[in-house]
């Protein structure tokens, strides 16, 4: 996956998680903490929510890794001058 695809996935996962956050009045980070502690009853919504959360974490790690690589390339190409910000097509 490239960064553009990763960002699309991350935004899609955020949207799904926000729907569940509104439904249960709880941030995903808090849900995940309670889930890890075994304090939440298993339900279809919880299983989906945990899946979205874990997948988003994985996608964010991949995004960060690709971004670091891209920044290294931009820095070496700019030779100490400010890096231009270009849209990715």
PLM regions with names:
Residues 1-89:
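Extended, charge-rich alpha-helical interface modules
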């Amino acid at each position: 996956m490239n960064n553009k695809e990763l960002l699309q996935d991350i935004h899609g996962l955020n949207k799904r998680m926000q729907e569940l956050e509104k439904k249960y009045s709880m941030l995903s980070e808090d849900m995940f903490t309670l889930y890890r502690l075994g304090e939440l009853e298993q339900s279809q919504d919880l299983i989906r929510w945990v899946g979205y959360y874990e997948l988003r974490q994985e996608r964010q790690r991949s995004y960060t890794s690709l971004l670091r690589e891209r920044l290294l390339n931009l820095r070496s190409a700019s030779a100490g001058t400010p890096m231009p910000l270009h849209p990715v097509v």
